[in-house]
């Protein structure tokens, strides 16, 4: 066990870290082996082993090294980190990322590595675990300079937060954010800590290194307290941003539909330009996007909102799409840009579960006795199914799934069952309507957005359409009272599509 020395020069570091950890008992340290994270590892170890002495609540701690594969020394650094954790009795693991596979997709390798690193780290967090990084005050100064370079507003200039929540799911703490690099160096030398020097830290092609090596030393020499002043400025910007969120909260809640994340844009016309831009920005952040630029907000307004009434505008935002339908804006995964080609698939009823293509979920059929279950409504919705997609923090993957049910007549012995995606010809007669309509007209009447229409499974018995599952049922699919059984068809799908089914259920009830 490493002994504890509570000399006055170290007490400030212990106090700041202890204060940041209040209420958290399962910690995961992002440990690179560099000076900063080595200092934090050492402090956390001492607090863990001497919680009574430092009035710190007991906590569990483990460390993760992210192997980027950028440096030729990455394997050696991983071994070093393993040994440092071993002598402290801290569980340790390594995760690998490959920056070069995606380098052509994003020219900024620095940002790419950071994004991949956080994604992998978040995916490794277990229930109630929080992530710790060793960012300090000097890192905050660099972040502010980079924000200035990008022309950021108060949100960007607020820098890094000591306590942040990502995607409403992952907690990130930065216990050393109020500490200077000099404090950490002094601690490391006095404790005789061993750390690695990353050779890429001297490469001034990277923006942070350029600032750290070429720009900031002269500034610190001229104004020794510059980092403290910048930290205060960042906090003031953060306070202003929090206040703005508070003031806009009521307006924002009136505009957004939480069931599918869509935004009513008609009311935006009555607001001032700054308020309109602020609301659009908060809407995009609602999807865990990076801070949208001024130019991007303007493009959404001009190219999507203000496009012709009969147009179907699409604006790609990295891996997302911004689309307009009727009086709403939608954010969608980029893979929903195009409609699916017509697909026809046979369903062998020996298997009651049918896996749909294109990650559209699964269908499940269940024969029921008509005497035991006569539904009041041909549709039924059950939310909060205990099934989630995965642990990614992407907004379209973090949503729970929704189970949509519909009840139709059972197939006859000579009827083959198939699932079709895409458009079909001819007039359709659906429950709730007396006159026939083409499928396109039905989609329009039920308010189904164009990008979802080709993704809704159509259930056929032979050549006869029975139901667009969860949306409408045809007269040919109506339950026949003289039959002994009916079919319950369930579609397990992403909740992002829930709104169209809620609308169709309301339509049938009316």
Curated annotation (Swiss-Prot):
Ligand binding (ATP): 32-37
Pfam families cross-referenced by the UniProt entry: ATP_bind_3 (PF01171), TilS (PF09179), TilS_C (PF11734)
Superkingdom to which the source organism belongs: Bacteria
Single GO MF descriptor: ATP binding
Localisation: Cytoplasm
Main location: cytoplasm
Signal peptide: none
Role of this protein: Ligates lysine onto the cytidine present at position 34 of the AUA codon-specific tRNA(Ile) that contains the anticodon CAU, in an ATP-dependent manner. Cytidine is converted to lysidine, thus changing the amino acid specificity of the tRNA from methionine to isoleucine.
Protein's UniProt name: tRNA(Ile)-lysidine synthase
């Amino acid at each position: 066990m490493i002994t504890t020395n509570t000399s006055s020069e170290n007490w400030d570091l212990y106090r700041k870290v202890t204060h940041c950890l209040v209420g958290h008992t399962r910690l995961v340290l992002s440990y690179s082996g560099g000076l900063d994270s080595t200092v934090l590892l050492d402090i956390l170890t001492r607090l863990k082993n001497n919680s009574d002495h430092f009035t710190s609540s007991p906590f569990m701690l483990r460390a993760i090294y992210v192997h980027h594969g950028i440096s030729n020394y990455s394997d050696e650094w991983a071994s070093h980190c393993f040994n440092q954790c071993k002598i402290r009795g801290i569980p340790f693991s390594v995760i690998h990322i490959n920056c070069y596979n995606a380098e052509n997709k994003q020219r900024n390798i620095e940002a790419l590595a950071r994004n991949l690193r956080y994604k992998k780290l978040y995916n490794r967090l277990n229930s109630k675990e929080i992530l710790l990084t060793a960012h300090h005050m000097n890192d905050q100064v660099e972040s502010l300079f980079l924000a200035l370079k990008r022309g950021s507003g108060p949100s960007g200039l607020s820098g890094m937060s000591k306590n942040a929540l990502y995607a409403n799911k992952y907690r990130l703490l930065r216990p050393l954010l109020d500490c200077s690099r000099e404090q950490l160096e002094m601690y490391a030398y006095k404790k005789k800590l061993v750390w690695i020097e990353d050779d890429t830290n001297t490469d001034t092609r990277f923006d942070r290194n350029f600032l750290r090596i070429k720009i900031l030393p002269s500034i610190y020499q001229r104004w020794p307290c510059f980092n403290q002043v910048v930290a205060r400025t960042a906090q003031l910007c953060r306070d202003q941003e929090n206040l703005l969120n508070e003031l806009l909260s009521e307006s924002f809640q009136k505009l957004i539909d939480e069931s599918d994340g869509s935004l009513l844009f008609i009311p935006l016309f009555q607001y001032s330009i700054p308020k309109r831009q602020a609301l659009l920005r908060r809407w995009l952040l609602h999807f865990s996007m990076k801070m949208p630029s001024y130019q991007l907000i303007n493009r959404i307004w001009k190219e999507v909102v203000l496009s012709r009434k009969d147009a179907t505008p699409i604006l790609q935002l990295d891996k997302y799409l911004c689309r307009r339908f009727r009086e709403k804006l939608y954010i969608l995964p980029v893979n929903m840009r195009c409609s699916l080609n017509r697909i026809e698939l046979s369903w062998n009823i020996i298997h009651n579960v049918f896996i749909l293509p294109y990650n559209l979920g699964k269908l499940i059929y269940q024969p029921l006795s008509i005497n035991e279950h006569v539904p009041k409504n041909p549709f039924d919705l059950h939310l909060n199914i205990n099934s989630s997609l995965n642990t990614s923090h992407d907004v379209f993957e973090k949503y729970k799934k929704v189970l949509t049910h519909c009840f139709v007549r059972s197939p006859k012995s000579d009827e083959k069952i198939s699932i079709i995606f895409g458009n079909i010809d001819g007039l359709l007669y659906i429950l709730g309507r007396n006159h026939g309509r083409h499928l396109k007209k039905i989609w329009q009447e039920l308010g189904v957005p164009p990008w979802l229409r080709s993704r809704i499974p159509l259930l056929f018995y032979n050549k006869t359409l029975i139901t667009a599952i969860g949306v409408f049922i045809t007269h040919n699919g109506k339950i026949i009272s003289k039959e002994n059984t009916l079919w319950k068809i369930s579609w397990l799908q992403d909740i992002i599509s829930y709104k169209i089914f809620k609308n169709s259920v309301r339509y049938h009830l009316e």
